[in-house]
Amino acid sequence: MNIDEASKIILKPYITEKTFAMVENEQKICFIVANDAPKPKIALAVKTLYNENVLDVNTARTIYGKKAFVKFESTDKSRDLATKIGML
C-alpha cells in the first residue's frame, strides 16, 4: 500500500478526553477512517503512514463517521505516535 492509498483510509485522528485516556491506559489511538475501509486495510494504512505495528483494530460507526480504535504493542509506542500526530 502506498501513502496516497493509506491517506484515503486514515482521514484524521479523533481527539477527545476519552480517547486521550485510551492512549495512556489501553495503548489505543482513535482515528476517523473511510466508511468502506475494512479492519485489515486500516491496520496496513497505520503501518504505512506511521511505521508502527498494530495488534488489533476495532471499529464503530458514529455520526462523525467510522471510528477505528487501533491498539499498539506498548504504551510507549502509542504515546510516541500520539505525540507525533499532535494528540499529546
Language model features with spans:
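Contiguous, often N-terminal, cationic amphipathic patches that form binding interfaces
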Residues: 1-88
